[in-house]
Each structure stands twice: as C-alpha cells, then as structure tokens.
Amino acid sequence: MYELEINEQMVPFNFGMGFLREINKRTSIPVEGMQNVRQNVGLRYSVAKLLDGDVEALVEVLDIANTGCDPRVTKKALDFFIDSEDTDIDEVFEKTLGFLKTANATRNVTLDVIKEVEKEKQKREAMERMKMEAMA
C-alpha cells in the first residue's frame, strides 16, 4: 500500500492487480495480424502520459489506485489537491511514478515504458545534432 498526504490526510493507494486490470481496460489496441482481437494497454499509455506531465492522467491513475481503499478520495478532492498552490505537482508525479516502478503488478511495464521513452528521446537528440552539424 502506498500513501500520499492529500488535503492534510494520509490517503492510501493500491497499485496491485485490481488497479492493473482496471487501468488496462481503459485503452485497447488491435493486435496486428489477428482479426477482431484487441490488447488492453491502458497502463502503458498512462505511464507515457505521466512522463509527459499529463495532469488528467495523474488524477485518473490516483483515482483508480484509490478504488477500494479507506479513506476513499473523490475526484473533486484530487482536483482540489492538484490545484492547490501548496501542492508540489512535480513531486506528486515523481511519487506516483515511483509507486508504479515498485509495485509488483506494474513494475515491469512501467520500467519498459520509461526505457522506451528514453531511447526515443536519445534518437531525437541525435537527429537534432545531425541537423545542426549539417547546417554548420
């Protein structure tokens, strides 16, 4: 169980199998070469959105992870927490990604997405360097 202090209250979050099943079914893609077969990939998309700083994705991830926990935090309370000047939003993103990196159910996919994003970033930087060198 993971916790964040939200509106002066410790709120629990569970990034286990229930979380994984729920978030995965939010986004599905067709499986290449297989007619009428789809694969649930919601966690992959959500991790990528978190890495991009998508605040809506952050609220969705926290809301799903709090399902079945006590106390249950509402989306309205999460919105208030995110909007508060006292909230360090970068820290909330870091902690949430940290939870996803360490929970057994989400660790491998999260680390894989982070690795892929880093590879793409390095490719883009290399292309930019090549363009700059070609222009010089």
Regions found by a protein language model. Give the residues of each.
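Charged interaction scaffolds used for protein-protein
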Residues: M1-M10, V31-A48, E56, G68-A136
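Short capping micro-motif at the N-terminus of alpha-helices
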Residues: F13-F15
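Short, surface-exposed, low-complexity cationic segments
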Residues: M17-N36
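Generic hydrophobic, helix-prone segments enriched in Leu/Val/Ile
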Residues: F19, V47-L51
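Active-site- and interface-proximal helix/loop "cap" or "latch" segments in soluble metabolic
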Residues: R26, L50-V55
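Alpha-helix-centered segments that form part of catalytic cores
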Residues: V59
